[in-house]
């Protein structure tokens, strides 16, 4: 049975996520940076607890293990690995004097390549990064600076796996003292290996992790009532810098919009109805795109319904497998004329 809204839901969610990336100027690299839920407060907070634990449990980190254990008898790949195929490396930012700017975008550049760590040996990864640095900054002082930062970043990862396991889980709960100690160790390591670059690389991340840890402590405090917990959580959030608060509000609005859109689709609201209801959350341009995707999906559903009816007629002929496949493929090509439509129909036929 085909789920009517599965494709458009997926596309809308992707569109919203990509929109957030463009607006915020952030390159999300999920193998490198574990995401922490920033949604509405759940007083039990089980998922946030798990995510924070993943961030500080460095002994099992894919990035650190990968960089430290693979052989080095490899050369730079002649083509981009599959994980980077079809993409372009982010630009390395410069300041007004031509030096490498001390901003988080430099880490975004390196993390872009680290998404390919499972496809390359450390030596090949190093060659790939060096090649792109030269390509972007050849002959400048920023080239030397970028190479030095990359070396420091790799040193950070190589030392990260050597940090002791602090036993951050007691039974089925987090040991908040151990988690705090682990965060302190990572912050200290970042300063030792990256120096002045530790702040642009990890400052915001460390602030978020410590904030999430404080939320967990409040949520876990059995001496507090639910009302007291909510008040303390609000007070804690108000201590965040205004820019961080604004970003959290924006992310929450986008999450709310995704939930609302999915519900509107389940309720079979028209595309224009969806646009009117989400324009306040997303703005007119994105709301229009969402409505247009919904409209195109309705057109697709009608096409597929027509195609499925004709395919049933082919099935009823009990043809030889080869002849059956030829006729079905011809039917697809005749009905689905836009790029990717025939492939989508074939996937639904499985």
UniProtKB/Swiss-Prot annotation:
HAMAP family: Lipase_chap (MF_00790). GO terms for biological process: lipid catabolic process; protein folding. May be involved in the folding of the extracellular lipase during its passage through the periplasm. One of its GO terms (molecular function) is unfolded protein binding. Keywords: Cell inner membrane, Cell membrane, Chaperone, Lipid degradation, Lipid metabolism, Membrane, Transmembrane, Transmembrane helix. It comes from Xylella fastidiosa (strain 9a5c). The keyword Chloroplast does not apply. It holds the Pfam family Lipase_chap. The gene is lifO. This is Lipase chaperone.
């Amino acid at each position: 049975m085909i789920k009517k809204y599965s494709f458009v839901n997926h596309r809308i969610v992707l569109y919203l996520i990509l929109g957030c990336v463009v607006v915020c100027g952030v390159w999300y690299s999920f193998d490198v940076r574990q995401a922490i839920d920033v949604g509405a407060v759940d007083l039990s907070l089980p998922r946030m607890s798990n995510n924070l634990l993943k961030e500080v449990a460095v002994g099992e980190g894919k990035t650190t293990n990968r960089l430290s254990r693979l052989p080095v008898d490899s050369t730079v790949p002649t083509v981009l690995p599959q994980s980077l195929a079809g993409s372009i490396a982010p630009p390395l930012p410069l300041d007004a004097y031509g030096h490498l700017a001390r901003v988080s975008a430099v880490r975004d550049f390196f993390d872009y390549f680290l998404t390919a760590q499972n496809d390359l040996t450390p030596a090949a990864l190093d060659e790939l990064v060096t090649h792109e640095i030269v390509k972007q900054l050849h002959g400048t002082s920023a080239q030397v600076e970028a190479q030095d930062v990359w070396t420091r970043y790799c040193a950070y990862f190589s030392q990260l796996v050597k940090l002791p396991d602090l036993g951050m889980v007691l039974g089925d709960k987090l040991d908040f003292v151990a988690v705090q100690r682990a965060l302190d160790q990572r912050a200290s390591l970042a300063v030792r290996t990256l120096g002045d670059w530790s702040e642009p690389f990890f400052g915001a991340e460390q602030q978020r992790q410590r904030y999430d840890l404080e939320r967990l402590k409040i949520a876990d405090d059995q001496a507090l009532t639910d009302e007291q917990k909510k008040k303390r959580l609000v007070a804690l959030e108000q201590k965040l810098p205004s820019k961080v608060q604004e970003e959290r509000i924006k992310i929450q609005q986008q999450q709310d919009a995704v939930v609302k859109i999915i519900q509107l689709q389940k309720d079979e609201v028209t595309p224009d109805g969806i646009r009117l209801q989400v324009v306040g959350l997303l703005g007119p341009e994105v709301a229009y795109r969402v409505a247009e995707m919904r409209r195109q999906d309705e057109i697709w559903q009608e096409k597929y319904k027509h195609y499925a009816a004709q395919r049933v007629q082919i099935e009823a002929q009990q043809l030889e497998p080869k002849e059956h496949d030829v006729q079905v493929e011809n039917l697809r090509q005749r009905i689905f004329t836009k790029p990717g439509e025939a492939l989508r129909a074939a996937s639904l036929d499985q």
